[in-house]
């Protein structure tokens, strides 16, 4: 349970960090969507380990294989299965963690819930699980772009106390994001962020930060009232990512400092006769339904739990102990979290697009 996400465009991820591989089954994808392994691979390459000195040195190519659901380069409407085989497992690095719990990791809670856990790489709690999400997100992005011209771009907004301020979510480009290894389009801030990560890596410690993501050209009407509000599903998707600890959309928590008059997005009519808002403090969503403005959201990620510094912990037998974790881990998850956040946004928007068309376009 808990391994599937979505309603009409529904994904189920499978596999473990040190098993034979990881992947995803996508159910509900419309037929005749042109997709290739190369398009999916381009997204996975942004997520894969070992891509720079500030990410985990685990050496995985993460080559994807489409096992079913695509024929002659087009989706068939049947379940799509995508597999990525694990190649660079080093299970011996985790032998000490068989008995000792990593502080702030899922080790203890998995053990307490199930009475058993895969301590090699964390099993299902490993960030390698997100490979399936990113692969599915590549297809969701293709559908969104093809049907509605939606563009989704994520980037690192802040690492520790270093925040990028010279970013316009309405104008930022993928090329700007990918211009440096930290995936921050503010070049000056990016240099400082990289220096921060380099220093913390040398100390065998870790740091966290914030990913901001914008979805542009989102059509009006996506989202459902009450329990299936668009921002609620976006929050669920974002908060299901490993190491995520916070979510906000539009003005977020800063909006609590404003009055209603200051915060309200006043309406206007543009030159094409379309109803627009003068500002976008709502973040593109009002009443749980997209209003046609850009959706802007932020996701906070904690520092990586597995660090090489010695920490106080406990064993499965209930004895106090110390642990200096071995293994290969990200000193900061933010650079690789960018495509993960984009994927979850794409999955939610694609699902709601199909649901909207099914309910509201049936008789039109």
UniProtKB/Swiss-Prot annotation:
Known catalytic reactions: 5-O-(1-carboxyvinyl)-3-phosphoshikimate = chorismate + phosphate
Sorted UniProt keywords: Amino-acid biosynthesis, Aromatic amino acid biosynthesis, FAD, Flavoprotein, FMN, Lyase, NADP
Keyword Secreted part of the UniProt annotation: no
Keyword Amino-acid biosynthesis: yes
GO cellular component: cytosol
Cofactor binding summary note: Reduced FMN (FMNH(2)).
Superkingdom assignment: Bacteria
Pathway of action: Metabolic intermediate biosynthesis; chorismate biosynthesis; chorismate from D-erythrose 4-phosphate and phosphoenolpyruvate: step 7/7
Binding site for FMN: 124-126, 287, 302-306, 328
Cofactor(s), by name: FMNH2
Binding site for NADP(+): 47, 53
InterPro entries from the UniProt entry: Chorismate_synth, Chorismate_synth_AroC_sf, Chorismate_synthase_CS
UniProt-listed CDD domains: Chorismate_synthase (cd07304)
Listed GO MF terms: chorismate synthase activity; FMN binding
EC number(s) reported in the record: 4.2.3.5
GO aspect biological process, one term: amino acid biosynthetic process
Record-linked PROSITE patterns: CHORISMATE_SYNTHASE_1, CHORISMATE_SYNTHASE_2, CHORISMATE_SYNTHASE_3
Function field: This reaction introduces a second double bond into the aromatic ring system.
Family: Belongs to the chorismate synthase family.
Subunit structure: Homotetramer.
PANTHER family referenced in this protein's UniProt entry, alphabetically: CHORISMATE SYNTHASE (PTHR21085:SF0)
Protein name per its UniProtKB record: Chorismate synthase
Lineage summary: Bacteria, Bacillati, Cyanobacteriota, Cyanophyceae, Oscillatoriophycideae
């Amino acid at each position: 349970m808990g391994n599937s996400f979505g309603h009409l465009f529904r994904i189920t991820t499978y596999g473990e960090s040190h098993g034979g591989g990881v992947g995803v089954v996508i159910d509900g994808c419309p037929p005749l969507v042109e997709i290739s392994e190369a398009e999916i691979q381009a997204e996975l390459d942004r997520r894969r380990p070992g891509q720079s000195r500030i990410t985990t040195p685990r050496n995985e190519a993460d080559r994807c294989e489409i096992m079913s659901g695509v024929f002659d380069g087009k989706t068939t409407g049947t379940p799509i299965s995508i597999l990525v085989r694990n190649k660079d497992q080093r299970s011996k690095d985790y032998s000490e963690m068989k008995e000792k719990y990593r502080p702030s990791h899922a080790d203890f809670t998995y053990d307490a819930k199930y009475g058993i856990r895969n301590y090699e790489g964390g099993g299902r709690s490993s960030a390698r699980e997100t490979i399936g999400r990113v692969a599915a997100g590549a297809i969701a992005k293709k559908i969104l772009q093809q049907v509605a011209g939606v563009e989704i771009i994520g980037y690192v907004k802040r690492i520790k106390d270093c925040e990028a301020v010279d970013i316009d979510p309405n104008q930022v480009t993928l090329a700007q994001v990918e211009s440096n290894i930290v995936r921050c389009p503010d070049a000056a801030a990016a240099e400082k962020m990289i220096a921060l990560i380099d220093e913390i890596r040398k100390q065998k410690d870790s740091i966290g930060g914030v990913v901001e993501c914008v979805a542009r050209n989102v059509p009006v009407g996506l989202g459902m009232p009450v329990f299936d509000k668009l921002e609620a599903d976006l929050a669920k998707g974002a908060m299901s990512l490993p190491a995520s600890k916070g979510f906000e959309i539009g003005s977020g928590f800063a909006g609590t400092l404003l009055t209603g008059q200051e915060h309200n997005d006043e309406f206007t009519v543009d030159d094409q006769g379309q109803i627009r808002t003068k500002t976008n403090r709502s973040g593109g969503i009002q009443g749980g339904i997209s209003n046609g403005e850009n959706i802007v959201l932020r996701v906070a990620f904690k520092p990586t739990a597995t660090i090489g510094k010695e920490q106080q912990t406990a064993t499965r037998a209930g004895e106090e102990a110390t642990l200096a974790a071995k293994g290969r881990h990200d000193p900061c998850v933010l650079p690789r979290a960018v495509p993960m956040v984009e994927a979850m946004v794409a999955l939610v928007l694609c699902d709601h697009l199909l649901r909207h068309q099914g309910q509201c376009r049936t008789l039109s």
